[in-house]
Amino acid sequence: MATLIYVDKEIGEPGTRVAAKDVLKLESRPSIKALDGISQVLTRRFGKTYDAPSALPKATRKALGTVNRATEKSVKTNGPRKQKQPSFSAKKMTEKTVKTKSSVPASDDAYPEIEKFFPFNLLDFESFDLPEERQIAHLPLSGVPLMILDEEGELEKLFQLGPPSPVKMPSPPWECNLLQSPSSILSTLDVELPAVCYDIDI
């Protein structure tokens, strides 16, 4: 094998001068050098260079050969097994289709209790009407805030109210006595504040 020779400049003559810009252009292109009648493409390399051996040792060849053979055998053994699995005879296929047809559940007549699983009508939940004794459609409820009625008498007074008129406006029961609201609402309104400290200079 011919030895590789690295030249510092593109032109192998030691006396030639090359500008810095030309050196960058020349380094990007490989140089062709004729050695012993064989043309070789040479590129500039830095550092130590080692020649690769022409051939691998026999021991490594044997090791790689056995590994390659083992993988080829495993591939070959796996291939036929996959091909053998889907091959079935026509009789076996017909028997399987008959079995699958027989395993299909019977018609709905055999299970009438499935229809009675829901004992109620689902459409009952779609109606939002109140019972007849609790109808509030005739009441003027436009702009009515949340009411808290303690007694049934106040509820009857509310039912006796007529349509609202600007001339005669009765005082609604939910606005008259605000202090008579339940104590639970008042307890939610109580907030404990920290003690006042007068020592701080402003």
Curated annotation (Swiss-Prot):
One GO CC annotation: nucleus
GO biological process: chromosome organization; homologous chromosome segregation
Places the protein is found: Cytoplasm; Nucleus
InterPro entries cross-referenced by the UniProt entry: Securin_separation_inhibitor
Origin superkingdom: Eukaryota
Region feature (Disordered): 60-105
Motif (SH3-binding): 163-173
Alphabetized UniProt keyword annotations: Cytoplasm, Nucleus, Proto-oncogene, SH3-binding
Gene Ontology molecular function, alphabetical: SH3 domain binding
Motif (D-box): 61-64
Coiled-coil positions: none
The keyword RNA-binding appears for this protein: no
Expression tissues: Expressed at low levels in the pituitary, liver, spleen, prostate, testis, ovary, small intestine and colon. Also expressed in various pituitary, testicular, liver and ovarian tumors.
Family named by the database record: Belongs to the securin family.
Description of its domains: The N-terminal destruction box (D-box) acts as a recognition signal for degradation via the ubiquitin-proteasome pathway.
Record-given protein name: Securin-2
Gene: PTTG2
